[in-house]
Amino acid sequence: MIAIIDYGMGNIRSVEQALKHIGAAYIVTSDKEEIFRSDGVILPGVGAFPKAMDVLEEKDLVRVLQEIGRSRKPLLGICLGMQLLFEKSEELQDCNGLSLLPGVIRKLKVPYKIPHMGWNELKKEGEIALWNGVEDGSFVYYVHSYYADCPNEIVYGISDYGVKVPGFVAKENIYGAQFHPEKSGDIGMQMLKNFKGVVESWKSSQLSI
């Protein structure tokens, strides 16, 4: 069972429809016990970083997500949800994040339209489980004005928008997509299927303990 975190700032409906499409068992919740009982977690998000962290704090979900991240349970952040995984953001004000990944969220300063909205090429950097069946140079769908300034060793996908935008990051059980896999057609569905597979593998490993 995958828990989609509902904290009032997520693209819940589209993520829900995508998981339904790939046949994944899921629940939309902000209940701490349901999240802990899940086999994997998706943290979506649309909006401002400081507001999102305030809401997560109010719902006591900061602690929950930090525990999930450190438990080896698969965790996928999408768009703002990915940005929240990092140490802090410069959006509107300096604001601490979940600190599950090293790096800072910074504003895009490019000679192009902001937000970065639409389809862009994703170049793979290294191999991870979520790349199974995903061709290098596939196009994915973005909507964002900020990007992750983070160590190269956690970057597994890059798009060019005047700067090298980390489109996909990963460290152990923690994954983050700056783009929207749920809006990225067959390629996005394949990535979500792969995440579903990672979740199922983790569940099997726990049953064998």
Curated annotation (Swiss-Prot):
Protein transport keyword on record: no
Cell location: Cytoplasm
Xref: InterPro entries: Class_I_gatase-like, GATASE, Imidazole-glycPsynth_HisH
Catalytic activity, reaction form: 5-[(5-phospho-1-deoxy-D-ribulos-1-ylimino)methylamino]-1-(5-phospho-beta-D-ribosyl)imidazole-4-carboxamide + L-glutamine = D-erythro-1-(imidazol-4-yl)glycerol 3-phosphate + 5-amino-1-(5-phospho-beta-D-ribosyl)imidazole-4-carboxamide + L-glutamate + H(+); L-glutamine + H2O = L-glutamate + NH4(+)
Major site of localization recorded for this protein: cytoplasm
Single GO molecular function: imidazoleglycerol-phosphate synthase activity
Residue numbers annotated as active site: 79, 180, 182
PROSITE patterns with a match to the protein in the record: GATASE_TYPE_1
Pfam families: GATase (PF00117)
Gene3D superfamilies: 3.40.50.880
Keywords: Amino-acid biosynthesis, Cytoplasm, Glutamine amidotransferase, Histidine biosynthesis, Hydrolase, Lyase
Annotated metabolic or biological route of this protein: Amino-acid biosynthesis; L-histidine biosynthesis; L-histidine from 5-phospho-alpha-D-ribose 1-diphosphate: step 5/9
Keyword Amino-acid biosynthesis: yes
SUPFAM superfamilies found in the cross-reference section: Class I glutamine amidotransferase-like
GO BP annotation list: L-histidine biosynthetic process
Residues annotated as domain Glutamine amidotransferase type-1: 1-205
EC number of the protein: 4.3.2.10, 3.5.1.2
Biological role stated in the UniProt entry: IGPS catalyzes the conversion of PRFAR and glutamine to IGP, AICAR and glutamate. The HisH subunit catalyzes the hydrolysis of glutamine to glutamate and ammonia as part of the synthesis of IGP and AICAR. The resulting ammonia molecule is channeled to the active site of HisF.
HAMAP family reported in the protein's UniProt record: HisH
NCBIfam families: IMP_synth_hisH
Quaternary structure and partners: Heterodimer of HisH and HisF.
PANTHER family with a match to the protein in the record: IMIDAZOLE GLYCEROL PHOSPHATE SYNTHASE SUBUNIT HISH (PTHR42701:SF1)
Name of the molecule in the record: Imidazole glycerol phosphate synthase subunit HisH
Gene: hisH
